[in-house]
Protein backbone atom coordinates (compact mmCIF):
# COMPACT_ATOMS: atom_id res chain seq x y z
CA UNK A 1 0.00 0.00 0.00
CA UNK A 2 1.44 3.44 -0.93
CA UNK A 3 2.78 5.64 1.86
CA UNK A 4 2.03 9.34 1.46
CA UNK A 5 4.70 11.64 2.88
CA UNK A 6 3.74 15.26 3.27
CA UNK A 7 6.46 17.72 2.31
CA UNK A 8 7.73 20.23 4.82
CA UNK A 9 5.84 23.45 4.32
CA UNK A 10 5.35 26.65 6.16
CA UNK A 11 1.98 27.55 7.71
CA UNK A 12 1.18 29.76 4.74
CA UNK A 13 0.59 26.75 2.46
CA UNK A 14 -2.34 24.84 4.00
CA UNK A 15 -4.04 24.36 0.62
CA UNK A 16 -1.43 21.86 -0.53
CA UNK A 17 -1.80 19.79 2.64
CA UNK A 18 -5.59 19.80 2.31
CA UNK A 19 -5.35 18.69 -1.32
CA UNK A 20 -3.02 15.78 -0.53
CA UNK A 21 -5.22 14.74 2.38
CA UNK A 22 -8.21 14.77 0.04
CA UNK A 23 -6.39 12.48 -2.42
CA UNK A 24 -5.54 10.10 0.43
CA UNK A 25 -9.20 9.92 1.45
CA UNK A 26 -10.27 9.15 -2.12
CA UNK A 27 -7.63 6.42 -2.40
CA UNK A 28 -8.71 4.61 0.75
CA UNK A 29 -12.39 4.96 -0.13
CA UNK A 30 -11.73 3.30 -3.50
CA UNK A 31 -9.99 0.23 -2.07
CA UNK A 32 -13.19 -1.57 -0.92
CA UNK A 33 -14.72 -1.02 -4.36
CA UNK A 34 -12.01 -3.01 -6.12
CA UNK A 35 -13.42 -6.55 -6.05
CA UNK A 36 -11.98 -8.56 -8.93
CA UNK A 37 -12.68 -12.28 -9.24
CA UNK A 38 -9.92 -13.51 -6.93
CA UNK A 39 -10.60 -10.88 -4.27
CA UNK A 40 -14.31 -11.69 -4.21
CA UNK A 41 -13.68 -15.29 -3.24
CA UNK A 42 -14.98 -16.66 -6.54
CA UNK A 43 -11.72 -18.46 -7.27
CA UNK A 44 -13.17 -21.33 -5.22
CA UNK A 45 -15.34 -21.91 -8.31
CA UNK A 46 -12.49 -23.86 -9.84
CA UNK A 47 -12.64 -26.49 -7.12
CA UNK A 48 -16.42 -26.73 -6.80
CA UNK A 49 -17.41 -26.67 -10.49
CA UNK A 50 -16.12 -30.14 -11.39
CA UNK A 51 -18.97 -32.01 -13.13
CA UNK A 52 -17.73 -35.37 -11.89
CA UNK A 53 -14.97 -37.09 -9.93
CA UNK A 54 -13.37 -38.06 -13.25
CA UNK A 55 -11.59 -34.67 -13.36
CA UNK A 56 -9.12 -33.13 -10.97
CA UNK A 57 -7.76 -29.60 -10.74
CA UNK A 58 -4.08 -29.41 -11.59
CA UNK A 59 -2.22 -27.37 -8.98
CA UNK A 60 -3.52 -23.94 -7.99
CA UNK A 61 -5.53 -21.42 -9.96
CA UNK A 62 -3.55 -18.65 -11.66
CA UNK A 63 -4.22 -14.95 -12.16
CA UNK A 64 -3.12 -12.16 -14.49
CA UNK A 65 -3.64 -8.40 -14.34
CA UNK A 66 -3.52 -5.80 -17.14
CA UNK A 67 0.20 -5.22 -16.66
CA UNK A 68 1.16 -8.87 -17.23
CA UNK A 69 -1.72 -10.30 -19.27
CA UNK A 70 0.53 -10.36 -22.35
CA UNK A 71 2.59 -13.07 -20.66
CA UNK A 72 -0.40 -15.38 -20.97
CA UNK A 73 -2.17 -14.42 -24.20
CA UNK A 74 0.49 -12.25 -25.86
CA UNK A 75 -1.03 -10.30 -28.77
CA UNK A 76 -4.61 -10.63 -27.55
CA UNK A 77 -3.89 -8.72 -24.35
CA UNK A 78 -4.44 -5.32 -25.99
CA UNK A 79 -7.86 -6.43 -27.22
CA UNK A 80 -9.05 -7.35 -23.72
CA UNK A 81 -7.50 -4.28 -22.10
CA UNK A 82 -9.27 -2.03 -24.62
CA UNK A 83 -12.56 -3.46 -23.33
CA UNK A 84 -11.80 -2.63 -19.69
CA UNK A 85 -10.13 -5.88 -18.57
CA UNK A 86 -9.52 -6.07 -14.80
CA UNK A 87 -8.27 -9.58 -14.05
CA UNK A 88 -8.03 -13.09 -15.46
CA UNK A 89 -8.32 -16.09 -13.16
CA UNK A 90 -7.93 -19.58 -14.55
CA UNK A 91 -7.22 -23.22 -13.83
CA UNK A 92 -6.25 -26.44 -15.58
CA UNK A 93 -7.94 -29.81 -15.19
CA UNK A 94 -6.79 -33.30 -16.11
CA UNK A 95 -8.65 -36.58 -16.39
CA UNK A 96 -8.07 -39.01 -13.54
CA UNK A 97 -8.52 -41.90 -15.97
CA UNK A 98 -5.09 -41.47 -17.49
CA UNK A 99 -6.43 -40.50 -20.93
CA UNK A 100 -4.32 -37.31 -21.09
CA UNK A 101 -7.55 -35.32 -21.48
CA UNK A 102 -7.17 -31.72 -20.30
CA UNK A 103 -9.45 -28.71 -19.86
CA UNK A 104 -8.42 -25.09 -19.31
CA UNK A 105 -10.89 -22.57 -17.89
CA UNK A 106 -10.17 -18.83 -18.05
CA UNK A 107 -12.51 -16.31 -16.40
CA UNK A 108 -12.00 -12.70 -17.49
CA UNK A 109 -13.38 -10.02 -15.18
CA UNK A 110 -14.24 -7.24 -17.64
CA UNK A 111 -15.55 -4.75 -15.09
CA UNK A 112 -19.13 -4.54 -16.34
CA UNK A 113 -21.71 -6.41 -18.38
CA UNK A 114 -21.35 -4.26 -21.51
CA UNK A 115 -17.61 -4.91 -21.74
CA UNK A 116 -18.11 -8.66 -21.26
CA UNK A 117 -20.78 -8.63 -23.97
CA UNK A 118 -18.45 -6.73 -26.31
CA UNK A 119 -15.67 -9.27 -25.88
CA UNK A 120 -18.03 -12.23 -26.32
CA UNK A 121 -19.60 -10.89 -29.52
CA UNK A 122 -16.18 -10.12 -31.00
CA UNK A 123 -14.87 -13.57 -30.15
CA UNK A 124 -17.82 -15.50 -31.53
CA UNK A 125 -17.70 -13.67 -34.86
CA UNK A 126 -21.43 -13.71 -35.54
CA UNK A 127 -21.82 -17.46 -35.03
CA UNK A 128 -25.20 -18.52 -33.69
CA UNK A 129 -25.15 -21.24 -31.09
CA UNK A 130 -27.86 -23.29 -29.42
CA UNK A 131 -25.84 -23.66 -26.23
CA UNK A 132 -27.72 -22.55 -23.15
CA UNK A 133 -24.99 -21.26 -20.84
CA UNK A 134 -24.85 -17.82 -19.21
CA UNK A 135 -26.35 -14.82 -20.99
CA UNK A 136 -25.08 -16.17 -24.34
CA UNK A 137 -22.67 -18.88 -25.37
CA UNK A 138 -20.99 -20.42 -28.37
CA UNK A 139 -18.92 -23.48 -28.95
CA UNK A 140 -17.28 -25.88 -31.35
CA UNK A 141 -15.06 -28.92 -31.00
CA UNK A 142 -12.78 -28.32 -28.05
CA UNK A 143 -13.89 -24.73 -27.41
CA UNK A 144 -16.73 -23.08 -25.50
CA UNK A 145 -17.18 -19.42 -24.57
CA UNK A 146 -19.91 -17.55 -22.74
CA UNK A 147 -20.51 -14.35 -20.82
CA UNK A 148 -22.51 -13.64 -17.71
CA UNK A 149 -22.74 -10.30 -15.94
CA UNK A 150 -19.22 -8.78 -16.01
CA UNK A 151 -17.47 -12.07 -16.75
CA UNK A 152 -16.31 -13.55 -20.05
CA UNK A 153 -15.35 -17.22 -19.83
CA UNK A 154 -13.34 -19.37 -22.23
CA UNK A 155 -13.03 -23.15 -21.94
CA UNK A 156 -10.54 -25.01 -24.11
CA UNK A 157 -10.60 -28.79 -24.03
CA UNK A 158 -8.26 -31.41 -25.44
CA UNK A 159 -10.33 -34.57 -25.09
CA UNK A 160 -9.85 -37.87 -26.87
CA UNK A 161 -12.36 -40.00 -24.97
CA UNK A 162 -15.91 -39.76 -26.31
CA UNK A 163 -17.51 -40.07 -22.87
CA UNK A 164 -15.83 -36.86 -21.67
CA UNK A 165 -16.57 -34.66 -24.70
CA UNK A 166 -20.10 -33.88 -23.56
CA UNK A 167 -18.87 -32.91 -20.11
CA UNK A 168 -17.48 -29.54 -21.25
CA UNK A 169 -20.91 -27.91 -21.52
CA UNK A 170 -21.83 -29.34 -18.11
CA UNK A 171 -18.66 -27.85 -16.68
CA UNK A 172 -19.45 -24.48 -18.31
CA UNK A 173 -22.97 -24.50 -16.86
CA UNK A 174 -21.55 -25.24 -13.41
CA UNK A 175 -19.11 -22.33 -13.70
CA UNK A 176 -21.88 -19.98 -14.90
CA UNK A 177 -24.17 -20.95 -12.03
CA UNK A 178 -21.55 -19.86 -9.51
CA UNK A 179 -20.68 -16.52 -11.08
CA UNK A 180 -22.45 -13.54 -9.54
CA UNK A 181 -25.11 -11.62 -11.44
CA UNK A 182 -27.93 -12.55 -13.80
CA UNK A 183 -28.18 -13.78 -17.38
CA UNK A 184 -29.72 -10.66 -18.89
CA UNK A 185 -27.89 -8.83 -21.70
CA UNK A 186 -26.61 -5.27 -21.20
CA UNK A 187 -29.42 -2.73 -21.31
CA UNK A 188 -27.50 -0.68 -23.92
CA UNK A 189 -28.27 -3.43 -26.43
CA UNK A 190 -31.89 -2.29 -26.49
CA UNK A 191 -30.97 1.03 -28.11
CA UNK A 192 -31.08 -1.09 -31.27
CA UNK A 193 -34.73 -1.96 -32.07
CA UNK A 194 -35.39 -5.70 -32.30
CA UNK A 195 -37.63 -5.51 -35.37
CA UNK A 196 -35.77 -6.73 -38.50
CA UNK A 197 -32.50 -7.04 -36.56
CA UNK A 198 -30.35 -9.99 -37.63
CA UNK A 199 -29.88 -12.23 -34.61
CA UNK A 200 -26.28 -12.42 -33.44
CA UNK A 201 -25.14 -9.37 -35.42
CA UNK A 202 -25.25 -7.07 -32.40
CA UNK A 203 -21.88 -5.87 -31.14
CA UNK A 204 -20.32 -3.29 -28.86
CA UNK A 205 -17.57 -1.31 -30.55
CA UNK A 206 -14.77 0.47 -28.72
CA UNK A 207 -12.10 2.40 -30.57
CA UNK A 208 -14.19 3.95 -33.33
CA UNK A 209 -17.39 3.05 -35.18
CA UNK A 210 -16.55 2.97 -38.91
CA UNK A 211 -12.99 3.65 -37.80
CA UNK A 212 -13.85 7.19 -36.65
CA UNK A 213 -12.32 8.22 -33.32
CA UNK A 214 -15.07 10.82 -32.81
CA UNK A 215 -17.58 7.93 -32.70
CA UNK A 216 -15.46 6.15 -30.14
CA UNK A 217 -17.87 3.62 -28.65
CA UNK A 218 -21.37 2.36 -29.20
CA UNK A 219 -23.76 -0.38 -30.26
CA UNK A 220 -23.82 -1.70 -33.83
CA UNK A 221 -26.19 -4.20 -35.44
CA UNK A 222 -27.22 -5.48 -38.86
CA UNK A 223 -30.77 -5.36 -40.23
CA UNK A 224 -32.59 -6.75 -43.22
CA UNK A 225 -35.22 -4.32 -44.53
CA UNK A 226 -36.87 -4.29 -47.96
CA UNK A 227 -34.34 -6.81 -49.22
CA UNK A 228 -31.37 -4.72 -48.09
CA UNK A 229 -28.84 -5.78 -45.48
CA UNK A 230 -27.95 -2.56 -43.70
CA UNK A 231 -26.10 -1.62 -40.53
CA UNK A 232 -27.23 0.69 -37.73
CA UNK A 233 -25.25 2.21 -34.90
CA UNK A 234 -25.79 4.19 -31.73
CA UNK A 235 -22.66 6.01 -30.56
CA UNK A 236 -22.67 6.93 -26.88
CA UNK A 237 -21.03 10.26 -26.06
CA UNK A 238 -20.34 11.93 -22.70
CA UNK A 239 -22.83 14.77 -23.28
CA UNK A 240 -25.23 16.26 -25.87
CA UNK A 241 -22.59 18.85 -26.70
CA UNK A 242 -20.08 16.08 -27.46
CA UNK A 243 -22.68 14.33 -29.62
CA UNK A 244 -23.29 17.48 -31.68
CA UNK A 245 -19.53 17.92 -32.07
CA UNK A 246 -19.18 14.29 -33.24
CA UNK A 247 -21.82 14.79 -35.96
CA UNK A 248 -20.07 17.96 -37.13
CA UNK A 249 -16.71 16.15 -37.20
CA UNK A 250 -18.24 13.37 -39.28
CA UNK A 251 -19.78 15.88 -41.67
CA UNK A 252 -16.43 17.66 -41.99
CA UNK A 253 -14.65 14.37 -42.68
CA UNK A 254 -17.06 13.48 -45.48
CA UNK A 255 -16.85 16.92 -47.07
CA UNK A 256 -13.05 16.76 -47.04
CA UNK A 257 -13.34 13.32 -48.66
CA UNK A 258 -15.17 14.94 -51.56
CA UNK A 259 -18.66 13.75 -50.61
CA UNK A 260 -21.80 15.87 -50.52
CA UNK A 261 -23.68 16.17 -47.23
CA UNK A 262 -27.36 16.92 -47.65
CA UNK A 263 -29.35 18.08 -44.61
CA UNK A 264 -31.78 15.63 -43.03
CA UNK A 265 -34.37 17.14 -40.71
CA UNK A 266 -36.80 14.26 -40.39
CA UNK A 267 -35.78 13.07 -36.91
CA UNK A 268 -33.17 14.04 -34.36
CA UNK A 269 -30.95 17.07 -34.81
CA UNK A 270 -28.08 18.15 -37.07
CA UNK A 271 -28.87 15.24 -39.40
CA UNK A 272 -27.35 14.63 -42.80
CA UNK A 273 -27.34 12.17 -45.69
CA UNK A 274 -24.09 11.38 -47.47
CA UNK A 275 -21.82 8.65 -48.87
CA UNK A 276 -19.54 6.89 -46.39
CA UNK A 277 -16.34 5.56 -48.03
CA UNK A 278 -16.71 1.79 -48.64
CA UNK A 279 -20.16 1.77 -47.02
CA UNK A 280 -22.52 3.27 -49.61
CA UNK A 281 -25.07 5.78 -48.37
CA UNK A 282 -25.27 6.86 -44.73
CA UNK A 283 -27.89 8.78 -42.77
CA UNK A 284 -27.04 10.19 -39.35
CA UNK A 285 -28.50 12.42 -36.63
CA UNK A 286 -27.91 13.51 -33.04
CA UNK A 287 -30.29 13.00 -30.13
CA UNK A 288 -29.27 13.83 -26.57
CA UNK A 289 -25.83 12.39 -25.81
CA UNK A 290 -26.09 9.98 -28.76
CA UNK A 291 -25.30 9.87 -32.45
CA UNK A 292 -27.48 7.42 -34.37
CA UNK A 293 -26.93 6.36 -37.94
CA UNK A 294 -27.59 3.80 -40.65
CA UNK A 295 -25.12 2.90 -43.41
CA UNK A 296 -24.56 0.37 -46.21
CA UNK A 297 -27.69 1.78 -47.82
CA UNK A 298 -28.29 1.38 -51.55
CA UNK A 299 -31.40 3.54 -51.14
CA UNK A 300 -32.18 5.97 -48.33
CA UNK A 301 -35.78 5.03 -47.48
CA UNK A 302 -35.06 1.91 -45.35
CA UNK A 303 -32.46 3.95 -43.47
CA UNK A 304 -34.94 6.71 -42.68
CA UNK A 305 -37.45 4.24 -41.26
CA UNK A 306 -34.84 2.49 -39.12
CA UNK A 307 -33.29 5.75 -37.91
CA UNK A 308 -36.71 6.99 -36.83
CA UNK A 309 -37.22 3.78 -34.83
CA UNK A 310 -33.77 4.07 -33.21
CA UNK A 311 -34.25 7.68 -32.15
CA UNK A 312 -37.74 6.89 -30.83
CA UNK A 313 -36.26 4.01 -28.81
CA UNK A 314 -33.49 6.19 -27.38
CA UNK A 315 -35.99 8.82 -26.28
CA UNK A 316 -38.11 6.16 -24.58
CA UNK A 317 -35.15 4.65 -22.74
CA UNK A 318 -33.45 7.86 -21.63
CA UNK A 319 -34.77 9.88 -18.66
CA UNK A 320 -36.53 13.09 -19.56
Regions found by a protein language model. Give the residues of each.
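Terminal interaction module
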Residues: 196-225, 293, 299, 314
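N-terminal secretory signal peptides that target proteins for export/translocation
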Residues: 1-16
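Boundary at the C-terminal end of the N-terminal hydrophobic targeting segment
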Residues: 36-41
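Bacterial N-terminal signal peptides
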Residues: 20-33
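A short acidic-to-branched-hydrophobic micro-motif
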Residues: 81-119, 153-155, 220-246
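Short Gly/Thr-rich strand-loop-strand
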Residues: 56-83, 100, 110-149, 190-215, ...
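Surface-exposed amphipathic alpha-helical segments
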Residues: 43, 159-189, 297-320
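Structural recognition of the beta-strand scaffold that forms the well-ordered cores
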Residues: 145, 152-155, 284, 291-294
